[in-house]
Amino acid sequence: MRIGIKKKPVGRIIYELTAVFALDSAGGGMVVNSLIALWLAQRFDFTLGRIGLVLGLMSLASAASALLSPMLSARFGMVETMALTHAPANVLLIAAAFAPNPQLAVLCLAGRSLLSQLDVPPRVAFVMSLVQPEERSATAAFTNLPRSIATASTPWLGGWLLTKSSFGWPLVIGGSLKLVYDAMLWIRFRKFSTRA
């Protein structure tokens, strides 16, 4: 691996993780806040004020997860925390698309926000645990660049889908991609998991 990872098996694991992380990010690009705002306006006729309130609630729920993540990682392991908290978040994201009323949709989105970021601290810690200290900066850059590109590559599709229908197709497709990420992460990487 050219980023400076000395152990070849670890280099391969980093490549695989990077690809799996990019899949998750592609799903995330389908449900950026601007597209969720557009969907809420189209589907439930939310005003800008209500949309702002919902997005604020989602952000607060997401911030709360930062406090829970280290405790879960220490108890269950990093990969377990990543996959097993992220999967229910994505089920809630998909469920929001099918919500028959705005209250249930907002409840699903808030629940999703509470769970969806629990994977971030253990993801970073897990990747860093695989490499030598002097390799961490390069590894972080290597794993984050494809994630950023993947996130940037899918909002257009979410927007296009919303021009065709007020149904939450971006939520369903984005959530489904993220569920595939969760399954791949669990199947392929749980044997490497450690407690943080």
Where are these regions (language model features)?
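Juxtamembrane intracellular "pre-TM" segments in multi-pass secondary transporters
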Residues: 1-25, 42
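Short amphipathic helix-loop junctions that connect adjacent transmembrane helices
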Residues: 34-51
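Transmembrane alpha-helix termini and helix-breaking/packing motifs in multi-pass membrane transporters
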Residues: 38, 42-43, 153-172
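Loop-to-transmembrane helix entry/capping segments in MFS-fold secondary transporters
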Residues: 48-49, 133-143
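Helix-to-loop junctions at the C-terminal end of transmembrane segments
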Residues: 65-78, 162-163
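Structural signature of the two symmetry-related core transmembrane helices
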Residues: 80-95, 175
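Helix-loop junctions at membrane interfaces in 12-TM secondary transporters
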Residues: 97-109
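Intracellular juxtamembrane helix-capping segments at the cytosolic ends
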Residues: 118-131
